[in-house]
């Protein structure tokens, strides 16, 4: 099921910073977002539910040390993904 991506301002800011520095990161992020739209639980994404202070959110891998934090939300009557953060493992957790 295709989902709509709803990036937060902080996600957009972080993704611009990351992709400006590194073309490989830009490509990894683009591919991960395409997979998220098609199937958020594609095995290549390693999607998992978060606990603790990030409870209610999910994380997926967008490359070796790149993670996307998101939530499943309703948007205009269908399921969407609210993109909250992107960065290295240490930056987002």
Describe these PLM feature segments.
Residues 4, 13, 23-26, 61-93:
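Enriched for short, Lys/Arg-rich terminal
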Residues 7-43:
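N-terminal first-folded block
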């Amino acid at each position: 099921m295709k989902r709509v991506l709803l990036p937060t301002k902080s996600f957009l800011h972080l993704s611009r910073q990351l992709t400006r520095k590194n073309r490989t990161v830009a490509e990894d992020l683009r591919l991960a977002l395409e997979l998220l739209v098609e199937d958020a639980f594609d095995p290549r994404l390693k999607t998992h539910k978060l606990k603790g202070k990030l409870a209610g959110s999910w994380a997926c891998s967008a490359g070796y040390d790149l993670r996307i934090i998101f939530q499943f939300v309703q948007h205009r009557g269908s399921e969407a993904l609210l993109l909250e953060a992107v960065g290295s493992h240490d930056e987002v957790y």
